[in-house]
């Protein structure tokens, strides 16, 4: 079944490249009370990389609602204290994407369905996995240093 998910992801990205699709997405940097950060590893695409939870914004959905929904769908966690960080342009995956990034808080352990998400967990900022994506590392560094967010993902 994951094979079909991977094929679908490849086909979707091909269509994005051909049609130059514009999309909107939302991601969240979700922290525990101890300051640990939630990271996920998808079961499609770059399956070896840890990234922030997130996904597309629905037609009648706010970016905040989309970020909370994506965290809930991908990890089973309910977020609180959702705060806007910034918007980023992203032309990865062949599309022209605007990513809305938020910080949030959550308690509990992530529960994944093991279909879309291969792995999820909270990590101390000084003990992140080696396989964190470059864009995710940049967002973490900006957050930790208090720097203004870059305009590109």
In which residue ranges do the predicted regions lie?
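Conserved hydrophobic "DFG−1" position in protein kinase catalytic cores
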Residues: 30-31, 39, 104, 122
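Conserved Nudix-box catalytic region and its N-terminal flanking loop in Nudix hydrolases
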Residues: 32, 36-73
């Amino acid at each position: 079944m994951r094979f079909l998910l991977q094929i679908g992801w490849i086909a979707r990205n091909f269509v994005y490249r051909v049609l130059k699709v514009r999309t909107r997405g939302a991601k969240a940097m979700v922290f525990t009370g101890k300051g640990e950060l939630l990271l996920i590893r998808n079961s499609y695409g770059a399956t070896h990389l840890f990234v922030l939870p997130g996904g597309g914004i629905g037609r009648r959905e706010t970016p905040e609602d989309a970020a909370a929904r994506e965290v809930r769908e991908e990890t089973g966690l309910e977020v609180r204290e959702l705060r806007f960080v910034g918007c980023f342009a992203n032309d990865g995956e062949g599309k022209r994407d605007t990513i809305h990034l938020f910080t949030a808080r959550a308690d509990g352990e992530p529960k994944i369905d093991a279909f879309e998400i291969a792995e999820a967990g909270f990590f101390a900022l000084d003990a992140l996995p080696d396989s964190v994506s470059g864009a995710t590392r940049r967002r973490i560094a900006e957050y930790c240093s208090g720097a203004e967010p870059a305009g590109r993902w």
